[in-house]
Amino acid sequence: MAKTPTRARKRVKKQVSDGIAHVHASFNNTIVTITDRQGNALSWATSGGSGFRGSRKSTPFAAQVAAERAGEIAKEYGVKNLEVMVKGPGPGRESSIRALNAAGFRITNITDVTPIPHNGCRPPKKRRV
């Protein structure tokens, strides 16, 4: 007895005009996530996922490419205005914001949301090179 094939419904992409770009810039990688106002992810990209590996992953150019890739997908949802939330001390902080601006988004607000401890965990020891 053969089953009748069930048709997969085509998902309709919701239209969002305002979004939030979360930029997580660590020393090793940069993650760019674009969400709607409620925090539901629309698109994301990373330096590592953009084809950079090893020490090249932690460069400003890799962060720029990641921001461009996340921005292209977010444009399909109709995002025009972005609020940018930057977290972390990495090298991709500024270049990812510049890339989003160059991609045609109107950046309305830039906020630094880097978590700062009130003397919490002991930090890692200093590097000796």
From Swiss-Prot:
Keywords from the UniProt entry: Ribonucleoprotein, Ribosomal protein, RNA-binding, rRNA-binding
Protein origin, superkingdom: Bacteria
Keyword Ribosomal protein assigned: yes
RNA-binding recorded as keyword: yes
GO molecular function: rRNA binding; structural constituent of ribosome
SUPFAM superfamilies the record matches: Translational machinery components
Self-association and partners: Part of the 30S ribosomal subunit. Interacts with proteins S7 and S18. Binds to IF-3.
Function: Located on the platform of the 30S subunit, it bridges several disparate RNA helices of the 16S rRNA. Forms part of the Shine-Dalgarno cleft in the 70S ribosome.
Family statement drawn from the similarity comment of this UniProt entry: Belongs to the universal ribosomal protein uS11 family.
Protein name, per record: Small ribosomal subunit protein uS11
Source organism: Aeromonas hydrophila subsp. hydrophila (strain ATCC 7966 / DSM 30187 / BCRC 13018 / CCUG 14551 / JCM 1027 / KCTC 2358 / NCIMB 9240 / NCTC 8049)
